[in-house]
Amino acid sequence: MAILKNDWAPLLEEEFHKPYYIKLREFLKEEYRTRTIYPDMYDIFNALHYTPYAQVKVVILGQDPYHGPGQAHGLSFSVKPGVPIPPSLANIFKELHDDLGCYIPNNGYLVKWAKQGVLLLNTVLTVRRGEANSHKGKGWEFFTDRVIELVNEKEDPVVFLLWGRHAQAKKELITNPRHHIIEAPHPSPFSAARGFFGHRPFSRTNAFLQKVGREPIDWQIENI
């Protein structure tokens, strides 16, 4: 299992020794040994690897990883280059185009966002191939709740983008009045037309960041 190497490491060190995590680790060892699990074991913590704690400006919460071959690589909503853009991400790009005029790219690889301080965090970090929510309730929620609590403790103002009921359930962890929450329905084709389209999260995020003296995000994902 990959161990954290940046400033998240001391902050999350004690989580790795808690009974829930030790149990989760044993479960995952067996799952990776006997089944096809996504993402690759070495990509599980990529959201934390790509976005150090000190650099977090925006959080986009997802649910669990994509469960198709070659899609998930540890960042919520993101897929590896060369993989078709999933429907929810296609709707995110459509809203980004309508909001800021960004062209719709030929890939869904969101590492550029992560490297600018956008924490792309799923609340569950692993999944069985072809079985959505198969690792729900196994312990990841305790771990990712702690990540959200740590971001909540930051002095620097952070924008939380909470799309859909699952993400909005985490609002109770965001108690620091410095931070800014933007809520909308999930970008899934089942709900995007009910208020995701037109809520302009990207321009609103940048307006807030600029208001508090932080660099805005360059949201354009380039063609590969």
Swiss-Prot record:
The keyword Hydrolase applies. Its main location: cytoplasm. Its EC number is 3.2.2.27. SUPFAM superfamilies: Uracil-DNA glycosylase-like. Gene3D superfamilies: Uracil-DNA glycosylase-like domain. Belongs to the uracil-DNA glycosylase (UDG) superfamily. UNG family. Excises uracil residues from the DNA which can arise as a result of misincorporation of dUMP residues by DNA polymerase or due to deamination of cytosine. This is Uracil-DNA glycosylase.
